[in-house]
Amino acid sequence: MTPAIISAFASHKFLHNLSEPLRMLLAAGVQPFQIKAGEYIGREGEVANGFFLVQSGRVSITANTPNRGEVEIQQLGAGEAVGWSWLVPPHKWEFNARAIDDVAGLRFDADWLRNTCEQNHALGYQFLKQLVQTLAERLKATRHQLSQTQD
């Protein structure tokens, strides 16, 4: 792993509450990723085979609706995590994640991450705490967005 990846990994907002030993354990499974504007990181219903930490660019999280088509729920940027469906069976994307800009970041293989969290309960617990915190923040943001929507 390059020094740039180690530095980016250690400074990412999603991982800042993890202890150094747990971050280093996770670092063994991280790979850089890049995606062009307009491309999808994942699509609703597809196999969720990765977990992504955004370092630059913006990602639109959308849902497919019967009456309105693809509707944006929120936008995520640097310091945010994308993709939690890898954790929950049947391991399929629940939402779409599309790059608004060119996006760069770090990616974990879903199988590797599930296995690593199962083998190291301390890591699994800390990772889940951070993931639940992230989901709670997103739910609050979605609630706020819905309260601002006028039909």
PLM segments and residue spans:
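Cytosolic regulatory regions built on CNB/CRP/Popeye-like sensor folds
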Residues: 1-151
